[in-house]
């Protein structure tokens, strides 16, 4: 990619071009992907035996194809190879995170398809693989940033950069934080993907928030490349909503949700915005937090906090329609995005 594209006056035009191509490609490839998934009988097999009411509410979703996240995989991979130079380490780092996260999700979707009750690989297996992928990405980022001031700092919302010190202990702390940020985001998006359009719409807002952080972080080594990946994610997410809004023609499955979470978490690590992601992705945090609290409460108190978890199912259980739940969560996601951007730009 010609570095001239990143002159200040042409940045917006360039990113709009990236967005437009990703969006058009997503719209164009959407129907062929859905047809292909139907031919391979990639339908949602997961049974909600933990909640009979949800089983009834989602009865009409049984014959909706899943693993539509392959659309994200295709568009994101084509985007980075089209716009970024093959000789740059960042290009191959992006390719690795796209391929690895989508492959893990695809494998999980395949296992779900083959099992009678639609359960994928075990939580332990998935967690170990997520840790390995995230560790590789974090190691690569730390290698790229070694020797720069960013190697020793952490961005804290409203307070700016905070020094981690030059000790090995500080770097070990950051490594653990970064790995957990990527793994946590992957799982949080995965948990959010339970209603038509919910995860894709929330992704648009979180990706836009991180994009603002990226284009204003001129001192970060990867700041010229990260916007390309985030803009492409924003474009394909909006395109996917055409097929995923209620009534959904396709679900993203783990192929899409883990890939999206992996991209958002990895970009946050590259931008040193791990803590900021908690604000920008507040809906994802709330969804994951509701599951953690529910499990902890059932284990130690023998009581449920929510009628059903993740949080969006709690509201469904209370009688709120699916479309209303999605609209409210999108609204919450918008305010989280605005608050996160303010926190990022606060000096």
UniProtKB/Swiss-Prot annotation:
Domain of life where this protein originates: Bacteria
GO cellular component term of the entry, any: plasma membrane
Bilayer-crossing regions: 10-30, 67-87, 91-111, 127-147, 164-184, 195-215, 220-240, 250-270, 275-295, 325-345
Keyword terms, alphabetized: Cell cycle, Cell division, Cell inner membrane, Cell membrane, Cell shape, Cell wall biogenesis/degradation, Magnesium, Membrane, Metal-binding, Peptidoglycan synthesis, Transferase, Transmembrane, Transmembrane helix
Membrane topology classification: Multi-pass membrane protein
Cofactor requirements of the protein: Mg(2+)
Signal sequence region: none
InterPro entries documented for this protein: Glycosyl_transferase_4, PNAcMuramoyl-5peptid_Trfase, PNAcMuramoyl-5peptid_Trfase_CS
Catalysed reaction, written as an equation: UDP-N-acetyl-alpha-D-muramoyl-L-alanyl-gamma-D-glutamyl-meso-2,6-diaminopimeloyl-D-alanyl-D-alanine + di-trans,octa-cis-undecaprenyl phosphate = di-trans,octa-cis-undecaprenyl diphospho-N-acetyl-alpha-D-muramoyl-L-alanyl-D-glutamyl-meso-2,6-diaminopimeloyl-D-alanyl-D-alanine + UMP
Pathway involvement of the protein, from the record: Cell wall biogenesis; peptidoglycan biosynthesis
Coiled-coil zones: none
CDD domains documented for this protein: GT_MraY
GO biological process, one term: regulation of cell shape
GO molecular function, one term: metal ion binding
Record EC number: 2.7.8.13
UniProt subcellular location: Cell inner membrane
One Pfam family of this chain: Glycos_transf_4
PANTHER family: PHOSPHO-N-ACETYLMURAMOYL-PENTAPEPTIDE-TRANSFERASE (PTHR22926), PHOSPHO-N-ACETYLMURAMOYL-PENTAPEPTIDE-TRANSFERASE HOMOLOG (PTHR22926:SF5)
Primary role: Catalyzes the initial step of the lipid cycle reactions in the biosynthesis of the cell wall peptidoglycan: transfers peptidoglycan precursor phospho-MurNAc-pentapeptide from UDP-MurNAc-pentapeptide onto the lipid carrier undecaprenyl phosphate, yielding undecaprenyl-pyrophosphoryl-MurNAc-pentapeptide, known as lipid I.
Stated family: Belongs to the glycosyltransferase 4 family. MraY subfamily.
Protein name: Phospho-N-acetylmuramoyl-pentapeptide-transferase
Organism annotation: Chlamydia abortus (strain DSM 27085 / S26/3) (Chlamydophila abortus)
Lineage: Bacteria, Pseudomonadati, Chlamydiota, Chlamydiia, Chlamydiales
């Amino acid at each position: 990619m010609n570095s001239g594209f990143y002159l200040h006056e042409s940045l917006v035009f360039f990113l709009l071009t990236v967005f437009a191509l990703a969006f058009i490609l997503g719209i164009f490839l959407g129907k062929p992907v859905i047809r292909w998934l139907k031919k391979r009988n990639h339908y949602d097999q997961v049974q909600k035996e933990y909640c009979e009411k949800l089983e009834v509410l989602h009865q009409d979703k049984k014959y909706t194809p899943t693993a539509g996240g392959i659309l994200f995989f295709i568009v994101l991979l084509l985007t980075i190879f089209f716009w970024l130079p093959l000789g740059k380490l960042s290009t191959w780092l992006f390719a690795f995170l796209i391929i690895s996260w989508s492959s893990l999700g695809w494998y999980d979707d395949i296992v779900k398809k083959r099992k009678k009750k639609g359960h994928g690989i075990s939580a332990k297996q998935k967690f170990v693989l997520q840790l390995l992928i995230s560790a590789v990405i974090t190691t690569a980022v730390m290698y790229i940033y070694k020797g720069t001031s960013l190697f020793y700092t952490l961005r804290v919302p409203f307070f700016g950069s905070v020094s981690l010190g030059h000790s090995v202990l500080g770097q070990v702390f950051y490594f653990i934080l970064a790995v957990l940020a990527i793994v946590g985001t992957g799982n949080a998006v995965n948990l959010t993907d339970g209603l038509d359009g919910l995860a894709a719409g929330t992704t648009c807002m979180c990706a836009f928030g991180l994009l603002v952080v990226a284009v204003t972080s001129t001192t970060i080594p990867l700041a010229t490349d990260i916007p390309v990946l985030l803009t492409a994610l924003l474009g394909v997410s909006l395109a996917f909503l055409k097929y995923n809004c209620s009534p959904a023609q396709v679900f993203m499955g783990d192929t899409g949700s883990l890939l999206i979470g992996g991209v958002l978490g990895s970009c946050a690590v590259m931008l040193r915005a791990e803590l900021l992601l908690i604000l920008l992705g507040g809906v994802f945090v709330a969804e994951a937090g509701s599951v953690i609290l529910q499990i902890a409460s059932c284990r130690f108190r023998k009581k449920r906090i929510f009628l059903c978890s993740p949080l969006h199912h709690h509201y469904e259980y209370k009688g709120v329609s699916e479309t209303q739940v999605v609209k409210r969560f999108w609204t919450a996601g918008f305010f989280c995005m605005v608050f996160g951007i303010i926190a990022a730009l606060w000096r």
